Amino acid sequence: MTLVMSPDSSYGRYDAPTPTDVTSPVHREREPELHIEFDGTTVLCRVCGDKASGFHYGVHSCEGCKGFFRRSIQQKIQYRPCTKNQQCSILRINRNRCQYCRLKKCIAVGMSRDAVRFGRVPKREKARILAAMQQSSTSRAHEQAAAAELDDAPRLLARVVRAHLDTCEFTRDRVAAMRARARDCPTYSQPTLACPLNPAPELQSEKEFSQRFAHVIRGVIDFAGLIPGFQLLTQDDKFTLLKSGLFDALFVRLICMFDAPLNSIICLNGQLMKRDSIQSGANARFLVDSTFKFAERMNSMNLTDAEIGLFCAIVLITPDRPGLRNVELVERMHTRLKACLQTVIAQNRPDRPGFLRELMDTLPDLRTLSTLHTEKLVVFRTEHKELLRQQMWSEEEAVSWVDSGADELARSPIGSVSSSESGEAVGDCGTPLLAATLAGRRRLDSRGSVDEEALGVAHLAHNGLTVTPVRQPPRYRKLDSPTDSGIESGNEKHERIVGTGSGCSSPRSSLEEHNEDRRPPVSADDMPVLKRVLQAPPLYGGTPSLMDEAYRRHKKFRALRRDTGEAEARTVRPTPSPQPQHPHPANPAHPAHSPRPQRASLSSTHSVLAKSLMEGPRMTPEQLKRTDIIQQYMRRGESSAPAEGCPLRAGGLLTCYRGASPAPQPVLALQVDVTDAPLNLSKKSPSPPRTYMPQMLEA
């Protein structure tokens, strides 16, 4: 039945097409893949396999599955769980038996409530559906043609034999000519690895060997592609078959290169390789012996080119390879190829009916050799990578050793061991590492001059390679001296100043003077930047040194110092002080009678501290009340006792005035200005002696 899709058809409900360009490659890449099942030219339902009526809820489905899914999501029906492990097959004839598994399959194939589309069917969607249908019909036609070709045994036999002859270079006639030429003019190769077909990689480059062997491997891959039915397999199945059977087919093709009577192998480049010359490391002797034994067994059968081609096809197309998906098609191809081989053997060897079984019995041994060869190849790759890594490390260590040795001789903070080696020149070698390894390091004799010809021209020959080292100007390092601190002061002169020699001069110092005489004059441009700056004249004017500028006070401390200095100058001036009404006894410690020293006081250097000390004592209200009580008792005592008998006045700590509270004298200033007494940083005024308090209270 033909499916007709017209713009007015009720084939689904779709969104309007977007304005995106359909022909753009980016749009083609972003288009989702269509999951469409066909029965000839009819689109089938993704759920039950019935004829699809349109695109419903995101998939192509029939009317029955569309209605079932709509009822389930609209009414939110909870179906009874399946009693058959939830794996019921949903078909057209039994889709109503298990509703639970039917809804589960609807969701699994992609049906969704949000996938409903409205509008007409887009032209792009129609084109995609038609293309998928055409591709499906084309692939089905190819499968039918391949099936017909597999069923046609003579045609299959002819195609396989022709493919073998076109892709294999080592047929019986060609190998016979190579063997005759090798026996007449034998050219033996050097000892090589355990791989039987490795043509002396020590004498030829790896690139040449890879190119020569890659051509043979490519022939096996092309041969597999020409086998009827191989192109119908998926890419994964093709890769699985080639990966597991490539060495087997390659070994069957090259089995005629082994010469068992002479215990030799004809390599791909035509050279002969003796069996004893193969290296037997890493248990390779067992692999070599097994390979020669299997080759002798296969060569004794005298297979023809047609039999070898069919046997190679059977080795490649094997249904028991792990990872195959389309096992049925592979098994079908294997059966047809085996039947063709039986036909050829029956024609060539009618007297040996069991020859096919004998040939098929070699397959387990062939797979064993393939496994051994793969293991040996893995070991070889690991050892080869490790060897290359060690060579790279050794080269890097050699280069770093040469560089570190040159740097250590050029600038060693400890100095050399002997004085004779300290004056040698360290030159940069511009030759490759090979020249440095072959020539070694040359040292100059410090007691004599260096031969210019020996330094300038030095040729090194190795395997026809001539290396000429490039001469570079030698570098001299400064010798260690007991008085050398390692820091340049910037006052050194470019010209060497000759002075009187030291009485305890050593050979080292003489060598140093000799080297300094030979040192070329250094221009100002070659000097370090710091050295040029230190030798330049100062940029600021005046005689003050750089340290004075560095330790100059901040501007806020300068202003405060200026204010305190003026106040101190006014205080230092000698002014007549008025005599009090009640003169006290002479007290040299009183600030009013003791002249200030003419030198700079502490206030000039500690302005903030002096200001805080010159302020009056700050007392709490309780202390002020207590002071008033004491002053009242003192006034009462003045009327009864003479002024000279007052112990407080005699102590010079308090001065009482009539009719007013006494003003405190600058006792703190006295304590600050006295040079002999220690500096008192307390802001509180000293309390009167406790011995006078009872007398004051009694008065």
Curated annotation (Swiss-Prot):
Implicated in the regulation of ecdysone-triggered gene hierarchies. Probably plays a key role in mediating the regulation of the larval molt by 20-OH-ecdysone. This is Ecdysone-inducible protein E75. Residues 510-520, 561-571 have a biased composition (Basic and acidic residues). Residues 1-31, 466-528, 561-607, 679-699 are annotated as: Disordered. It is found in: Nucleus. PROSITE patterns: NR_LBD, NUCLEAR_REC_DBD_1, NUCLEAR_REC_DBD_2. GO terms for biological process: cell differentiation; hormone-mediated signaling pathway; negative regulation of transcription by RNA polymerase II; positive regulation of transcription by RNA polymerase II. SUPFAM superfamilies: Glucocorticoid receptor-like (DNA-binding domain), Nuclear receptor ligand-binding domain. GO terms for molecular function: nuclear receptor activity; RNA polymerase II cis-regulatory region sequence-specific DNA binding; zinc ion binding. Keywords: DNA-binding, Metal-binding, Nucleus, Receptor, Transcription, Transcription regulation, Zinc, Zinc-finger. Residues 42-118 bind DNA. SMART domains: HOLI, ZnF_C4.
